[in-house]
């Protein structure tokens, strides 16, 4: 904390004595700015000074006046996306210039370790195909990534570390694997530059990405205990409420973006009853503070992990699925089919390519309105009990399913609430589920345990979302 205060004082002294425009780190060489809109540019200068901003794409001079603390902000009109490299010159008497700027689409990634997970992987946790992805990364000249350093703060701050990097083998190992694969698909389809801001922290809870005044209302959160202001406790920051919001969200809210991508939830397992509403609150707050309307919010279902007997994370997945129903302009992709059996106790599954692609399909279909792209897999609709079997109907399965035999992931129970592995077979456009041990079915579940991967998808290979027909405790 003392080091942070000293650094802040030095920055203020430099600004006052040099009179040179100081920009936040997120405004840097190589950045991508959102196309065809008014983007915000901001920073510090001398107190009550006029700052001029001159982008090379229109050679127009925009002006802003700093306040008594030297803070200023301006809005600048951006052109249509292209691969032309631009510059922006800032001056309050002395000049600062940013170079190699692209105009395109900017997406903000956040969450915990599965969003943070870089192409280089974690210890004993590789990313599938990473070496090839890294080796060929320089071909993606239109992709730029800004990785925000972990920055837990007790109070909101104005700046955080993390500047834009071009895509190349030297830089790519540090890129979010999910974010980069999202960007690759988006760049291929839209053929315009894609910018990714990755502000994630492994192990973080949803409460960590909310401000103090909201978290203070939650009866299960003790701020004085959970924040722990004392110095020397940086290691636990990822589990603390509000700290990520203060240090990794608040400093970035002036940056104009197209939408949010979210991969989080593992650290909220066991708190499924509050998760959907708190995620909704977070999205509402972020949208309000960015001030860009109802920005799209697409998120990832937590992957199968842990015991095949328990269902704590299954309840969290159910809360995630329900969250998309109460969050406007949102959607969730499933990962139930993307985990190998040997990854049962690996909370960081290796397949990040399909996670990124599925997020891209959702953005391309819903946000960019590209017809013909499917983004949502089958969703449980209804159940009929007939002749000792459960006949299940689904939405988003009009073309049928991806397999005719060896259907896995289903369980069935009678009124005794004891679930048994079930036989599942196609029955026209339905799936027929039964078990010799359950003569009179009452409920069916699919993928509804901590680790219960399934293999059902529609003919676009988008997986069936885990579900249960019951509401038993």
Explain the meaning of each model-derived region:
Residues 1-22:
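Bacterial Sec-dependent N-terminal signal peptides
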Residues 20-473:
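Cell-envelope and extracellular/periplasmic
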């Amino acid at each position: 904390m003392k080091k942070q205060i000293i650094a802040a004082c030095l920055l203020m002294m430099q600004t006052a004595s040099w009179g040179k425009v100081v920009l936040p780190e997120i405004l840097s060489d190589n950045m991508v700015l959102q196309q065809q809109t008014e983007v915000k540019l901001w920073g510090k200068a001398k107190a009550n000074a006029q700052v001029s901003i001159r982008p090379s794409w229109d050679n127009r001079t925009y002006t802003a006046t700093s306040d008594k603390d030297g803070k200023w902000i301006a809005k600048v009109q951006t052109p249509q996306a292209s691969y032309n490299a631009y510059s922006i010159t800032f001056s309050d008497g002395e000049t600062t210039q940013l170079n190699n700027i692209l105009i395109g689409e900017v997406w903000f990634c956040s969450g915990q370790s599965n969003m943070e997970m870089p192409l280089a992987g974690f210890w004993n946790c590789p990313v599938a195909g990473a070496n090839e992805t890294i080796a060929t990364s320089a071909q993606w000249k239109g992709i730029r990534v800004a990785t925000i350093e972990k920055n837990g703060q007790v109070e909101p701050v104005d700046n955080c570390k993390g500047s834009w990097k071009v895509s190349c083998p030297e830089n790519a190992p540090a890129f979010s694997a999910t974010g980069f694969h999202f960007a690759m698909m988006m760049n291929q389809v839209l053929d315009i530059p894609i910018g990714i801001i990755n502000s994630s922290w492994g192990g973080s809870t949803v409460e960590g990405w909310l401000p103090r005044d909201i978290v203070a209302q939650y009866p299960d959160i003790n701020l004085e205990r959970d924040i722990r202001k004392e110095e020397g406790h940086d290691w636990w920051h990822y589990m603390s409420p509000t700290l990520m919001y203060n240090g990794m969200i608040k400093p970035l809210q002036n940056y104009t973006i197209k939408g949010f991508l979210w991969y989080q939830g593992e650290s909220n397992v066991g708190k499924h009853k509050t998760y959907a509403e708190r995620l909704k609150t977070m999205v509402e707050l972020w949208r309000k503070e960015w001030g860009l309307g109802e920005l799209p919010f697409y998120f990832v279902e937590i992957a199968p992990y842990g015991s095949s007997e328990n269902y704590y994370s299954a309840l969290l997945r159910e809360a995630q699925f329900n969250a998309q129903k109460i969050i406007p302009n949102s959607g969730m992709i499933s990962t139930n089919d993307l985990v190998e059996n040997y990854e049962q106790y690996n909370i960081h599954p290796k397949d990040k390519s399909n996670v990124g692609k599925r997020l891209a399909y959702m953005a391309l279909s819903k946000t960019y309105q590209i017809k013909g792209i499917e983004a949502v897999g089958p969703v449980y609709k209804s159940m009929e009990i007939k002749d000792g079997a459960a006949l299940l109907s689904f939405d988003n399965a009009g073309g049928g399913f991806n397999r005719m035999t060896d259907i896995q992931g289903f369980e069935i129970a009678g009124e005794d609430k004891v679930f048994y592995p079930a036989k599942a077979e196609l029955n026209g456009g339905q799936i027929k589920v039964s078990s010799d041990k359950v003569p009179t079915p009452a409920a069916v579940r699919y993928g509804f345990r901590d680790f219960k991967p399934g293999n059902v998808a529609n003919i676009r290979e988008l997986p069936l979302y885990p579900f249960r027909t019951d509401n038993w405790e």
